[in-house]
Amino acid sequence: MQTELASQPETWTRAAQLAAGNSTALPAAGERVAIVGCGTSWFMGQAYAALREQSGQGETDAFAASEFPAGRPYDRVIALTRSGTTTEVLELLGHLRGRVRTSAITADPRTPVMEAADDLVVLDFADERSVVQTRFATTALTLLRAHLGLHTEEAVADARTALAEPLPENLVACSQFTFLGRGWTVGLANEAALKMREASLSWTEAYPAMEYRHGPISVTTSGTATWMFGQAPEGLAEQVRGTGAQWVGGTLDPLAELVRAQRLAVAVADARGLDPDSPRHLTRSVILPSA
């Protein structure tokens, strides 16, 4: 996992270059789009959907593949699937065949998704051995950001900074973690929380930042770390610090902040004697038996 974490600046650069050559496999401006996935891929889809709508390129929804609204019309459905074998994704693509244009973004084209989708974008250079996703997720989102014209070299530089700088002091010792986001970074907050749960078995939550005051702040204690992706709502940092919790304000590109959160998940796992590459009860892909 450490090697995969460290390679993200390079895989982001390659993905951004790849975006220009895959214009037909990715949504055109004005298309009504849904993006689907499971776990990490769903959360990257949430971030992309918000980014695409904010940039004025068309209505975009994100769904867990198992919760796709079958009767809702779209011009294109994008499936994010690292393995290309996830049952819910393949079943949905099969259901949609001939009804709507589908695109899949995957790390392995030698899998059933190659035949299941109409168009394919392969990020094999971002594939991973670890069960826990890190670089494939951020590389796929970089591809999509670049296709929207929103990728910058500063994001890559910030990723290098996120890998090089020490984590905030005393963060590893916290007993509870909360990640907050606004707009497209809500998806990143959800993903950061999932990384902490998977890799370090930590009690971790995620919310839209403005929702934190509406109940969740009640569990905040001196053992809590509250981490904000992007600009915080006015007064929230002070309110969180007032509970005794540790506040972490993101200063880097939000996707680079996710890299910092990935590092935190590994550090907490190491401190607890856990193997972050092979979390309990998890496999690299969820393949369900046929009905």
Question: How should each PLM-predicted stretch be described?
Answer:
Residues 29-157, 163-164, 182, 225-251:
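Glycine-rich phosphate-binding loops that contact phosphosugars or nucleotide phosphates
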Residues 1, 117, 231-232, 239-291:
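Phosphate-moiety recognition in structured ligand-binding domains
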Residues 7-10, 18-19, 135-176, 270-291:
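YjeF_N-associated NAD(P)HX repair module
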Residues 1-31:
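An N-terminal, well-structured beta->alpha segment
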